[in-house]
Curated annotation (Swiss-Prot):
EC number(s) on file: 1.7.99.1
Paired cysteines (S-S): none
Keyword Iron: yes
Cofactors demanded by this protein: [4Fe-4S] cluster; hybrid [4Fe-2O-2S] cluster
Summary of the function given for this chain in its UniProt record: Catalyzes the reduction of hydroxylamine to form NH(3) and H(2)O.
UniProt-listed HAMAP family: Hydroxylam_reduct
A Gene Ontology molecular function term of the record: 4 iron, 4 sulfur cluster binding
Localization (cell): Cytoplasm
Organism in which the protein naturally occurs: Geobacter metallireducens (strain ATCC 53774 / DSM 7210 / GS-15)
Residues modified as Cysteine persulfide: 404
Cofactor binding note: Binds 1 [4Fe-4S] cluster. Binds 1 hybrid [4Fe-2O-2S] cluster.
Protein name: Hydroxylamine reductase
GO terms for biological process, alphabetical: response to hydrogen peroxide
Binding site for hybrid [4Fe-2O-2S] cluster: 250, 274, 318, 404, 432, 457, 491, 493
Length: 549
């Protein structure tokens, strides 16, 4: 059984994974994820039509987010779990179809036109083997016969996947938006419309970037409403003597619930990877047993997790194939899944807690502290100092160096870049790419740390607010600021953040360590001509270009 997947930066040979995914995804799971996209297209076709008649159901709207999130890199590898979601997808498609047909009949006095082919007419197979066969018939290469149009469709779909992840987090925090739900349906339905051309999908991709700013803003509002604005916070990177639970992922609401349930039980809760910024939120840092930051970025988990003796839980990506040395201590939650790993449904984490209590304690092993919590509220709180520093010449340039980390060789570029940034420049960072350099010493400029950790990948929203505020203060556009964006990417959330930046007209962005395999030469030329988007080259050359030397 073969497969083809090219959605992440680690696409084999820079083309795509066709035997097994570098991420660990096998052909069976790849086929089921392809079928999920196909099924969601069918659901979206009817949901879009129903919405035009004023008919909608929130549970169906939310499922589209869940379904797309399921197909994000390093989220769900469990075929049984995905098969269950496919059945839900089919049931919801049939339900919204029936609601649409009823509304159409009531409005027009006649039956709705029947759709007899394509994803809207999909009939689900009866067993797992049948689902896999269906998925194999609807892979990436079936999106469109024209390579450039297919590339634009993929950019749109991967942007939708990234936005779905953020919208899912926001929804869990009570933030939702009708315009966002409607766009998911419109855009997914469009990907199945043979009448749509290249510029239609370019336009939809830009619209996706625009709406993602709204979604990231909703998520920011949800975080702030629940936990307050992040504040600069020192975080120890060592361990202390106590039982422990390691939390990996991005979902702060899940972390909060775990902190509540572990309070007073002699268990420390350690953030891993993108959970590090939790320490900056007053509503989370008030828990004394939220402690430390164990390990580095996601791709090092196989080396690091065997050395964490407690329970481990993933609440979003990035999960990798677990080693036997810790698989029996590993749990998944939300959209995450791996065969043989215990999945926690709902908000009762007693199984995780009991496992942690059974496990050995961590040792007292003090280590250096790192800083986090420099969201836009904190940075703009000292904006006068920043502006004064720029005007006085103490701060010559800002570098946004961040994004996803990964295992592919070449990512040491970002370490070297951060190290070589001149002493009169400030580095903004976010997402797990920060682990390439966040334990290095950078000093400060007039009391302002030279390295400012803005937060998670979704806190690109904060980075944008900082950039827009600086542009306003200096009465110029963002492109006129002494600001360079040199980003690392890995999966689909990075794609939608890039679309958001492009929607704002931000130019001269460099991305790496390699360009997406799903971008054809013609589509790349369009991005270069319109946005001067380009790949990283060498540290010295890119620094000279950024500093105008």
């Amino acid at each position: 059984m073969g497969m083809f997947c090219n959605q992440c930066e680690q696409a084999a040979k820079g083309v795509g994974c066709d035997i097994i995914g570098v991420c660990g995804k096998n052909p069976e799971v790849a086929a089921l994820q392809d079928l999920m996209l196909y099924g969601l297209k069918g659901l979206a076709i009817y949901a879009d039509k129903a919405r035009e008649l004023g008919v909608k159901e929130e549970k169906i709207d939310y499922f589209v987010l869940e379904g797309l999130f399921t197909t994000v890199t390093n989220v769900d590898f469990d075929p049984v779990q995905i098969a269950g979601k496919l059945r839900t997808c089919y049931d919801y498609k049939e339900r919204i179809k029936a609601l649409y047909e009823t509304a159409y009949r009531e409005k027009n006095g006649s039956s709705a036109p029947q759709i007899t082919a394509g994803p809207a007419a999909w009939v689900i197979a009866g067993d797992l083997e049948g689902l896999v066969k269906q998925g194999q018939e609807h892979g990436i290469n079936t999106h469109h016969a024209d390579a450039d149009i297919r590339s634009a469709i993929e950019i749109l779909i991967y942007g939708l996947k990234g936005m779905a992840a953020y919208a899912d987090h926001a929804y869990i925090l009570g933030k939702k938006d009708e315009e966002v739900f409607a766009f998911f349906h419109k855009a997914m339905a469009a990907t199945a419309d043979p009448a749509k051309g290249l510029m239609d999908f370019v336009g939809l991709a830009m619209e996706c970037g625009k709406l993602n700013i709204k979604v990231m803003g909703m998520l920011n509002e949800g975080h702030v409403a629940h936990y307050g604005h992040p504040v600069p916070t020192k975080v120890p990177t060592g361990t202390r003597k106590n039982k422990g639970i390691l939390v990996s992922g991005h979902d702060l609401r899940m972390l909060e619930e775990l902190l509540k349930q572990t309070d007073g039980k002699g268990i420390d809760v350690y953030p891993h990877g993108e959970m590090l910024p939790a320490h900056g939120y007053p509503g989370l840092k008030k828990y004394a047993h939220l402690y430390g930051n164990f390990g580095g970025a996601w791709q090092d988990q196989a080396k690091e997790f065997p050395h964490f003796p407690g329970a481990i839980i993933f609440n979003t990506n990035c999960i990798q194939r677990p080693a036997d040395s810790y698989k029996d201590r590993l749990f998944s939650w939300g959209q995450v899944g791996w065969p043989g790993v215990k999945h926690i449904n709902g908000w009762d984490f007693s199984e995780v807690i009991n496992k942690a209590l059974e496990c050995p304690e961590l040792a007292d092993a003090p280590a250096k502290e790192i800083l986090t919590g420099f969201g836009h509220n904190a940075v703009l709180g000292v904006a006068d100092k920043v502006i004064e520093g720029v005007k006085a010449g103490a701060i010559k340039h800002f570098f946004l160096i961040g994004g996803c980390d990964g295992a592919k060789p070449g990512r040491n570029y970002y370490t070297e870049l951060a190290e070589k940034v001149p002493q009169d420049c400030v580095i903004l960072t976010l997402a797990c790419g920060k682990y390439r350099f966040n334990k290095l010493e950078f000093g400060d400029i007039g009391g302002i740390p030279r390295l400012l950790d803005i937060g998670q990948c979704n806190d690109a929203y904060s980075a944008l607010q900082i950039a827009l505020a600086l542009a306003d203060a200096f009465k110029c556009g963002v492109n006129d600021l002494p600001l360079s964006m040199i980003l690392s990417w890995y999966e689909q959330k990075a794609v939608v953040i890039l679309l958001s930046l492009l929607h704002l007209g931000i130019k001269n962005i460099k991305i790496g360590p390699s360009l997406p395999a799903f971008v054809t030469p013609n589509v790349l030329n369009f991005l270069v001509e319109n946005f001067n988007l380009g790949p990283i080259t060498t540290v010295d050359a890119d620094l000279k270009a950024a500093l105008g030397q």
